[in-house]
Every structure is written in C-alpha cells, then in structure tokens.
C-alpha cells in the first residue's frame, strides 16, 4: 500500500479539507486527552491560518492522504536541523489498513531524498494507540517533556532510524 498517489502534496486550496479532517479526527482521537473545548469550540479561522502558513512555508511539506479519490487523512513533515513528522492523522475507519505504515514509508522516502538518516515525531503520552503504532513502525522512545502545566501539552519523542 505504498502507492505514491495516496500522498498528494497540499496546496492553499486544501487548507479547509485538512482542518475538516483535523476536527473530525481530533473529535474521535483526543476526546478525553485534550480539553473538550478544543473540539467543541474548534477555532476554524485560527486553524485555517495556521495550516495556510505551513502550506506556504518551504520548511513544511503537507500531504493529503487519499484513497479512492477521498481525503482520509493528512501528514505534515517539517524539515529543519532534523526532519520531524509533525502530524499524521488518519480517520478512524481507515486505520489498521496499512495507511499509517504507508505514511511512515513515505516519510522515510522523503528522508532518503534529503540524505537524512533519521526522523523524529512527537506524541501525546496518553495517546496509547499512536504510541503503540510508532513503536510497531520501529520508533525508539528517545525523550519526554512531561513538565507542562497543561497535561495535554506534554509529549514523548520517537526517533526512526533509516536502514
């Protein structure tokens, strides 16, 4: 399931689709982890501005994930001193079908094009499903920031080393 057509580089016209996916996925994934108001009072304008800034910033590569012509998720890669899988979100009905694995392979290919030997990603510690996924994909836990006043802002860091 590593079809490159699955990953379509996002343009400014895709920002609303991405934040629509974000709202849907956050509502099913982060309820009970993030404060409810982050889903219930979702600030569409703020998220659109944030997404447009990423899409327009050459340090970011934003992709819609598509299957059968339908947007089923998105991923964002940030390229700075280290390549970071900034976000990987897949709607629940398409999880456990190889889409996430294909996304990790896509990020690895991106790293290969940049001559990078590894990439990292951050995850909310309470998101046990994502953590288990990253570990199954070969991620090694290399750090944690558990000192934030707001528990949902804490993170753990995984590193993926390319073979």
Task: Indicate where each model-derived feature is located.
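Acetyl-CoA-dependent GNAT
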Residues: 5, 9-12, 19-93, 104-106, ...
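Structural motif
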Residues: 21, 114, 136-137
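Active-site acidic-Proline motif in GNAT/NAT acetyltransferases
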Residues: 91-97, 125-126
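Conserved GNAT acetyl-CoA-binding A-motif
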Residues: 111-123
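Conserved beta-strand-loop-alpha-helix junction that forms the acyl-donor binding cleft
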Residues: 121-131, 148-153
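Conserved acetyl-CoA-binding loop of GNAT-fold acetyltransferases
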Residues: 135-143
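Terminal substrate-recognition subdomain of acyl/acetyltransferases
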Residues: 155-163
């Amino acid at each position: 399931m590593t079809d490159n057509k699955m990953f379509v580089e996002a343009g400014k016209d895709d920002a609303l689709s991405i934040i629509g996916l974000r709202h849907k996925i956050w509502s099913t994934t982060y309820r009970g982890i993030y404060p409810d108001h982050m889903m219930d009072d979702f600030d569409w304008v703020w998220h659109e501005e944030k997404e447009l800034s990423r899409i327009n910033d050459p340090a970011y590569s934003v992709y819609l994930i598509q299957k059968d012509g339908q947007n089923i998720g998105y991923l964002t890669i940030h390229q700075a001193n280290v390549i970071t899988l900034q976000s990987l979100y897949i709607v629940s009905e398409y999880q456990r079908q190889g889409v996430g694995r294909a996304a990790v392979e896509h990020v690895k290919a991106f790293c290969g094009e940049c001559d990078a030997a590894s990439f990292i990603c951050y995850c909310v510690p309470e998101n046990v499903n994502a953590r288990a996924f990253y570990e199954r994909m070969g991620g090694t836990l290399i750090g944690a920031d558990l000192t934030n006043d707001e528990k949902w802002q804490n993170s753990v860091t995984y590193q993926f080393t390319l073979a």
